[in-house]
């Protein structure tokens, strides 16, 4: 994906379900955005996107589906964020071009483990573009693009149908994930 594929994601409040009409297991994400010293960063921006429960991004879905599993959320005064989406599943990178040919020549598979993408930013701090990978996802140890780091793998706790963390009645099992982000101060610009 390139930046033009991501532009225009809606600004939504904390607690929003980003996965309305998206296939996949419901998942509640929460955590904080902190500085290196552990100070919460209020009003930090999380630009979030993921595929559906079958590994398809909205631009890969048939028809005009609009933006799905995407949104921009700001942290609260304590640096907290929370939203609902889906538990990401593994998927293949395109194999019909040079990357596919390279992977084939190397004897490597084209799969990425399940992950959700985020660009996390705050005024005065270096932005970070990253993923949260689902612990236990297939291909964690052999990601086609070598993007997995242990620090980016999060536990997805499974819960039976019942009351979700937002008070919503869930008629299917759901997951919860807690993950904190740390941002470095921006480098000062030389005069």
Give short role names for the model-derived ranges.
Residues 4-191:
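Beta-strand-dominated extracellular/periplasmic modules and repeats
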């Amino acid at each position: 994906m390139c930046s033009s594929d991501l532009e225009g994601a809606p600004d939504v409040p904390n607690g929003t379900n980003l996965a309305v009409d998206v296939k996949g297991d419901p998942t509640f994400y929460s955590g904080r955005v902190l500085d290196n010293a552990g100070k919460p960063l209020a009003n930090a921006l999380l630009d979030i996107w993921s595929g559906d429960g079958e590994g398809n991004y909205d631009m890969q879905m048939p028809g005009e589906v609009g933006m799905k599993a995407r949104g921009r959320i700001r942290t609260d005064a304590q640096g907290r964020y929370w939203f609902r989406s889906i538990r990401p599943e593994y998927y293949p990178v395109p194999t019909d071009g040079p990357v596919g040919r390279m992977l084939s020549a190397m004897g490597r598979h084209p799969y990425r483990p399940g992950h959700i993408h985020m660009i996390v930013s705050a005024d005065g701090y270096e932005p970070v573009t990253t993923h949260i990978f689902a612990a236990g996802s297939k291909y964690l140890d052999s990601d086609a693009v070598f993007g997995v780091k242990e620090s980016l793998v999060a536990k997805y706790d499974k819960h039976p149908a019942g009351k979700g963390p937002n008070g919503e009645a869930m008629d299917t099992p759901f997951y919860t994930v807690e993950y904190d982000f740390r941002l470095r101060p921006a480098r000062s610009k030389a005069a």
